[in-house]
Amino acid sequence: MAKHLFTSESVSEGHPDKIADQISDAVLDAILEQDPKARVACETYVKTGMVMVGGEVTTSAWVDIEELTRKTVREIGYTHSDMGFDADSCAVLNAIGKQSPDINQGVDRADPKEQGAGDQGLMFGYASNETDVLMPAPITYAHALVKRQSEVRKDNTLPWLRPDAKSQVTFAYEDNKIVGIDAVVLSTQHCDSVSQSDLIEGVMETIIKPVLPAQWLNKETKFFINPTGRFVIGGPMGDCGLTGRKIIVDTYGGMARHGGGAFSGKDPSKVDRSAAYAARYVAKNIVAAGLADRCEIQVSYAIGVAEPTSISVETFGTGKVSEEVLIGLVRQHFDLRPYGLTEMLDLARPIYKATAAYGHFGRNEFPWERTDKAEALRADAKL
């Protein structure tokens, strides 16, 4: 019987890198709301007392970057200088310029259906039937822990919590089936006055136990709650944050491969984002159709070229039909050209800020999580 452990981590919305992601996507959403055809590449840097927003934009829209930034930071919960970061007093620097015309000529076409990819690159999508949202369990529960931390912070159930937090969950597998949780790490920023014993009890009873299924916890499960003993200085005061630094947290927690491109701040013409969403959509529908228990899709592009340069499928020995058949089904049922996938998933609209914390996948409010192609895939696979 083959045994192994697998670990994934997540971070809260108050983590410095996630602050940056949320600001970048707030800017993107505000622009797309006015101009759905805008080209946006927005990068953010945060550090004690300051935010710098930069990048390239081609749009007819006007957005108040400073007010948008302050609103985003305020919603996250950095509202007092005691935290080392205050939405109302931090400096906001705007360094956004125009997108290069060299890129524009490669992307834009007279016929929008022939729109070229905004860059070269390779993207992966993944799905697994080990959870009801067809995501790997380690990243799913790592996200759930920090999401719960945010909820009990914001509703004052645990009023001594502050916005910055990280989680990590190690699952035990036998023959690729979950048999339990081996270890849980949760580190949360807190105010100076709370005792270590109150913090540990509060986190265990209010965050960990309500989130993790009891049948996967046992006397051997190890819990590490604020293992350094103190986490008062956090957020941008503790570390600088940058857009696009949490690409494994954003995707599959390391369970699947990653092409290297980040998501936040990028409009749908950037295949780093849109094709990764489409690849998840494809993989999820293949698993939902019962054509595989696990499925990883790779798609690649050349800048200025509409058709993908490659499509490949890996089912890790769980496929019910050959991978050659699956590739044929993908080509038949999914339009993976940049224009096609934007239309297929209705991506040219302001839906992105919500993706920028707690994972882009496994959340059914997003269109790439639909399983509306599963029935047709199964029928054409003749299963």
Swiss-Prot record:
Residues 99-109 are annotated as: Flexible loop. InterPro entries: ADOMET_SYNTHASE_CS, S-AdoMet_synt_C, S-AdoMet_synt_central, S-AdoMet_synt_N, S-AdoMet_synthetase, S-AdoMet_synthetase_sfam. ATP binds at H15, D164, A165, K166, R230, F231, D239, R245, K246, A262, K266. One of its GO terms (cellular component) is cytoplasm. K(+) binds at E43. Its main location: cytoplasm. Its EC number is 2.5.1.6. PANTHER family: S-ADENOSYLMETHIONINE SYNTHETASE. Homotetramer; dimer of dimers. This is S-adenosylmethionine synthase. The lineage of its organism: Bacteria, Pseudomonadati, Pseudomonadota, Gammaproteobacteria, Alteromonadales.
